[in-house]
Amino acid sequence: MLTKYALAAVIVLCLTVLGFTLLVGDSLCEFTVKERNIEFKAVLAYEPKK
């Protein structure tokens, strides 16, 4: 029963991330979260289409 809910949670999380990426994909190059003394930074490295 718990595995069923865990699988559903993972699927919802993946769909949320995919949807967010599709919505802001053109402007998503850097994502930064700062909280107190912790900083999380994700940078997207890619080459634009020619």
UniProtKB/Swiss-Prot annotation:
**What domain of life?**
Bacteria
Has UniProt tagged this entry with the keyword rRNA-binding?
A: no
Q: Which InterPro entries match?
A: Hok/gef_toxin, Hok/gef_toxin_CS
Instruction: Give the Pfam families listed for this entry.
Output: HOK_GEF
Q: Name one GO cellular component term.
A: plasma membrane
Q: Which UniProt keywords apply?
A: Cell inner membrane, Cell membrane, Membrane, Toxin-antitoxin system, Transmembrane, Transmembrane helix
Instruction: Report the record's Gene Ontology biological process terms.
Output: DNA damage response
Family, per the entry? Belongs to the Hok/Gef family.
The miscellaneous annotation reads: Interrupted by an IS186 element, which silences the locus in strain K12 MG1655.
Q: What does this protein do?
A: Toxic component of a type I toxin-antitoxin (TA) system; if it expressed it could be neutralized by antisense antitoxin RNA SokE.
Q: What is this protein called?
A: Toxic protein HokE
Q: Which organism is it from?
A: Escherichia coli (strain K12)
